[in-house]
From Swiss-Prot:
It is an enzyme of class 4 (lyase). Its main location: membrane. One of its GO terms (cellular component) is membrane. One of its GO terms (biological process) is paxilline biosynthetic process. InterPro entries: PaxB-like. GO terms for molecular function: lyase activity. Keywords: Lyase, Membrane, Transmembrane, Transmembrane helix. The chain crosses the membrane at residues 23-43, 49-69, 78-98, 112-132, 134-154, 172-194, 205-225. Terpene cyclase; part of the ATM2 gene cluster that mediates the biosynthesis of paxilline, a mycotoxin that acts as an inhibitor of mammalian maxi-K channels. PaxG, the geranylgeranyl diphosphate (GGPP) synthase is proposed to catalyze the first step in paxilline biosynthesis. Condensation of indole-3-glycerol phosphate with GGPP by paxC then forms 3-geranylgeranylindole (3-GGI), followed by epoxidation and cyclization of this intermediate (by paxM and paxB) to form paspaline. This is Terpene cyclase paxB. Belongs to the paxB family. Disruption phenotype: Impairs the production of paxilline.
Amino acid sequence: MDGFDVSQAPPEYQAIKPLADLFVVGMGVGWIINYIGMVYISFKHETYGMSIMPLCCNIAWELVYCLVFPSKSPVERGVFWMGLLINFGVMYAAITFSSREWGHAPLVERNISLIFFVATMGFLSGHVALALEIGPALAYSWGAVICQLLLSVGGLSQLLCRGSTRGASYTLWASRFLGSTCTVGFAGLRWMYWSEAFGWLNSPLVLWSLVVFLSIDGFYGICFWYVDRNEKSLGISGPKKAN
């Protein structure tokens, strides 16, 4: 029993499955709000909201677990498909406006579409290889951990490098945090009530990843507040456009 087929779950987990499904819905709501918000912010600020590599890794993960190794849970499948479809809009907006951020690097500016394609295919092959190596159930979770850490580090790095709230907002940060913390809650229930399959979630590496995620995303909120306050003190009415 690898934990991917919910029908194989023990009675203890089946009893709290509605709560687990609620966390999955919360995860979906958080990320769908985040994706829709990123599309809106991208067109409003004429830039991209998610860093390039995290975006490519994230959409590759969704493609793999929607098409190649789909979950047997209808709730998870529904959430993943909604997220994937909206994420295509995020990718389109990112490709449309990415060149505006790379005027200082002509090689990147002229080949941005190719970079997105190659990076997405690279991450997609990596997620598939991981699933074939350790099994879809474990790879599904470890791939999500990789995506989350890339998103957290990439988001903070992008904010600090731009020195501007361009492409970002409190709503994007809060919705991303909601989606990710609901994922943690969902995983926690599986660890507590389905330990036969998910006892590994109590491993040092998983706990380290959780601490890193909470620390970086918490620090992101502080940095965003500081950058936003600085923009207002300088009389900047809106996020600065890229040069």
